[in-house]
Amino acid sequence: MFKLKNKKMLKKIIIVIIIVGAIGGAYGLYVFFMPHRDVQSVEAFATISANDLVAEYLKDNAAANLKYLADDGDSKVLNITGRVSSIETDQKNQLVLILKDEGAAIGVSCTFMESTNKNAKKLKVGDVVKIKGVLRSGVDEDSEMLEEDVIIENCDVLS
């Protein structure tokens, strides 16, 4: 009788695990296939210069993160103006522009999408541009006092 009870309990536990796994898998697929936000069609939260955005982060990183970043992944869409200091291509063949004034230690890194690369290819170092994108990371200071640029993704050139 004792063995029979254990088999029934084991069967119930296995059924519960399968049900929970199926629900978790279904939710994972739902999130994976959910449409991504079209950054270019969303109204910008603010228009700000690259220098002012960097200065805001250097002044109070926590306050700037509260203002621009969101835990749910829907961080603020910004229009950023600044001078192009470098143009690079990342591993995904996406253009990455750095907006900062000459002599500035840090700036704003703007990563374009494959579909918007063509709009950024006409830009040259020294051009003053207005770019729309979503903020992903503020100024990052590590323990060695190295600072990373503010990171903007899904960018496109406005002017």
Language-model region placement:
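OB-fold and OB-like single-stranded nucleic-acid-recognition modules
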Residues: F2-S159
